[in-house]
């Protein structure tokens, strides 16, 4: 009888963590393990690359609204979730003001923390041998999944993010193991949460071979200006990635007489901020 594994993540938009997840899914031996994948939203450019031998579970409406505007949550009559998210936003603002943080990482953590009580159980009739929470926040796998062992993944360098350490410690503690993608990530994480050292394991990212091969074969339509230096940055538009400073950096490079164009590809909550910074700086960043 096959061991049953559940992996929980957000969506499959372009990003390093999502690509790493594809690498794991490609390399799991499905002759030995039966793998269920629960995505809160069936969205993203990488969704089509999920291997066919992986069982993609149906969406659950309550989970799909977590990343959508609160007005949409109200329209879909998820009133308790809307109230919980409003409360989470309020608590995040209070925390940031108290700590004098300009923009911390607590907003999304609080969003999951205060909505979890209203979320339905994922696969209520199944007890898994192992459940993996692949992206933070990690509340739902601990409280909404039945499994003999539970693992939370960490992709973030904690030396560059501002978090509510007391709240997050309570989030991480219930897990049997915490999988870090690198020694540096482990080091920064343990500086913040030294008491979790015994739970740490190292599992480096696995490149998704199929995805890379398919993308390498695709024709690139964009024609670049050969008379300038073209730079390209790809990633999630979030505070730790520092994309919002790229327009100013690009402007400074131009002021030094270097002919450059800087292209940004990605998605995320900082997109509006980045576009504003581009308008303020120079259209050579796009």
Describe the residue ranges of each PLM region.
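Nucleotide-sugar donor-binding and catalytic loop/hinge architecture
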Residues: 1-3, 214-230, 254-256
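N-terminal strand-loop element at the rim of the active site
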Residues: 13-14, 32-103, 200
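Nucleotide-activated donor-binding/catalytic signature segment of Leloir-type glycosyltransferases, i.e.
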Residues: 55-57, 272-286
């Amino acid at each position: 009888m096959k061991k049953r594994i559940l992996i929980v993540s957000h969506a499959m938009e372009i990003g390093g963590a999502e690509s790493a997840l594809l690498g794991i899914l490609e390399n799991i031996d499905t002759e030995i393990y039966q793998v269920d994948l629960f995505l809160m939203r069936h969205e993203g450019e990488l969704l089509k690359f999920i291997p066919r031998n992986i069982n993609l579970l149906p969406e659950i409406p309550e989970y799909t609204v977590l990343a959508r505007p609160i007005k949409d949550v109200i329209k879909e009559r998820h009133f308790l979730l809307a109230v919980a998210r409003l409360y989470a936003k309020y608590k995040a603002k209070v925390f940031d003001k108290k700590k004098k943080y300009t923009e911390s990482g607590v907003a999304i953590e609080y969003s999951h923390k205060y909505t979890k009580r209203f979320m339905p159980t994922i696969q209520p009739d199944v007890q898994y041998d192992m459940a993996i929470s692949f992206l933070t926040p990690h509340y739902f796998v601990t409280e909404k999944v039945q499994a003999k062992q539970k693992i939370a993944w960490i992709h973030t360098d904690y030396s560059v993010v501002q978090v509510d350490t007391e709240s997050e410690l309570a989030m991480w503690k219930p897990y049997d193991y915490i999988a870090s993608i690198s020694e540096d990530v482990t080091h920064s994480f343990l500086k913040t949460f030294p008491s979790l050292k015994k739970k740490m394991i190292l599992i480096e990212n696995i490149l998704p071979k199929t995805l890379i091969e398919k993308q390498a074969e695709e024709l690139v339509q964009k024609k670049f200006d050969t008379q300038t230096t073209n730079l390209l940055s790809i990633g999630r538009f979030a505070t730790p990635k520092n994309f919002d400073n790229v327009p100013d950096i690009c402007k400074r490079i131009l002021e030094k007489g270097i002919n450059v164009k800087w292209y940004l590809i990605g998605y995320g909550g900082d997109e509006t901020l980045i576009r504003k910074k581009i308008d303020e700086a120079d259209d050579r960043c796009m």
